[in-house]
């Protein structure tokens, strides 16, 4: 039922990649799945409330009761050590193929937008009693997506999420300093240099 709901509201665009065309959806399907799995795996089941999914003209919203897991906040989402509130449930989700084995599903959520130069996922409305993810609708930046694809093909592997964050910020503001880029990835200037190589 959720897949039908999603498919009906998930517009598609195409990007030419050499002789091939790549479908790019408003909301990356893997990112959506990871966000939904995270909402169920990391919520506090002692609290009343539901996992909510809403797709509207502005974007996709997924929210769940309770705040982030202890030790995780909006500033370290991508850098905090992965650990869950419900490890048994997370393990079952991994075993049946719904969750990331690496415990880095949050990376997938960001990659779903960053790979195509689209607006970043936003957790800024999360509180101590609610985790709320907003993924804005946005057209892919075809030139940016091609540059990312070409670079990944050249190096023979996927770019890490920190590199994607840096490239996305440089696309937005080409005059960024290393210090500003360190703020973007919530890390050190040394890690910016490593991610940029």
Identify the meaning behind each predicted range.
Residues 1-197:
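C-terminal regulatory or interaction extensions
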């Amino acid at each position: 039922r959720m897949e039908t709901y999603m498919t009906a509201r998930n517009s598609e665009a195409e990007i030419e990649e050499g002789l091939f065309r790549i479908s790019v959806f408003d909301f990356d399907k893997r990112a959506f799945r990871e966000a939904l799995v995270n909402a169920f795996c990391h919520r506090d089941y002692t609290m009343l409330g539901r996992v909510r999914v809403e797709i509207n003209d502005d974007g996709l919203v997924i929210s769940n009761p309770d705040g982030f897991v202890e030790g995780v906040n909006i500033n370290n989402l991508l850098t905090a050590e992965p650990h869950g509130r419900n490890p048994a449930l997370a393990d079952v989700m991994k075993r049946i193929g719904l969750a990331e084995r690496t415990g880095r599903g949050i990376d997938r959520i960001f990659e779903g937008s960053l790979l195509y130069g689209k607006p970043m996922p936003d957790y800024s409305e999360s509180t101590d009693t609610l985790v709320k993810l907003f993924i804005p609708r946005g057209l892919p930046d075809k030139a940016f997506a091609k540059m990312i694809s070409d670079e990944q093909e050249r190096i023979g592997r996927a770019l890490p999420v920190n590199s994607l964050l840096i490239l996305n910020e440089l696309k937005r503001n080409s005059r960024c300093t290393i210090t500003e880029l360190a703020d973007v990835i919530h890390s050190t200037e040394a890690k910016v240099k490593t991610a940029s190589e």
